[in-house]
Regions:
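A short glycine-rich, Lys/Arg-flanked "PGG" loop and its adjoining helix->strand segment in the class I
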Residues: 139-148
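Conserved acidic residues
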Residues: 62, 105, 124
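Conserved alpha-helix/loop element of class I SAM-dependent methyltransferases that forms part
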Residues: 43-62
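Class I SAM-dependent methyltransferase SAM/SAH-binding core
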Residues: 65-116
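N-terminal, positively charged/glycine-rich alpha-helical extensions of SAM-dependent methyltransferases
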Residues: 1-32
Length: 148
């Protein structure tokens, strides 16, 4: 199938409430459609983001939080580079249900717009790919990422 360039034309960007967003992701994850759409759209952000981490870090035992992990696309890329101390959180249980079982040590449903339930300096790295977008995670979440 030909790659699509949809930019910000996806209906998800028009949704306003958390309930609308959760319902959309529930429907989008059916029959693994989300993952197939990411392939069809040539979504390379997870691979590109992990390549930056690989370029600037040499330790493979870093404690990493994949914030807004979705179906685990960033975690999969991290595993390819031998990172294994990875936790993931996402707002959508439907997305989390599609995560391969061997990617994350801990996987939790959580709203990133609320204070995170982690101690200060709990992680060496917080990766957040594709979540700071229309109607999703707000800028104040960055303060929490820095704290943890």
């Amino acid at each position: 199938m030909a790659k699509k360039n949809v930019g910000n034309k996806l209906p998800i960007y028009k949704l306003k409430t958390p309930k609308e967003i959760l319902n959309y992701y529930r429907d989008w994850t059916g029959n693994n459609k989300y993952n197939q759409d990411m392939i069809d759209m040539n979504y390379t952000a997870p691979k590109e983001t992990v390549s930056v981490l690989v370029k600037y870090t040499f330790e493979k035992d870093l404690k990493i939080l994949d914030a807004g992990c979705g179906t685990g696309l960033v975690g999969i890329e991290l595993k390819k580079h031998n990172y294994s101390n990875i936790d993931g959180v996402d707002f959508s249980q439907n997305m989390l249900d599609l995560v391969p079982k061997d990617i994350y040590k801990n996987l939790n449903k959580f709203d990133l717009n609320k204070p995170l339930e982690y101690k200060n300096n709990a992680y060496d790295v917080v990766m957040c790919v594709g979540t700071f977008t229309y109607g999703h995670v707000k800028a104040h979440a960055l303060d929490e990422f820095i704290r943890i």
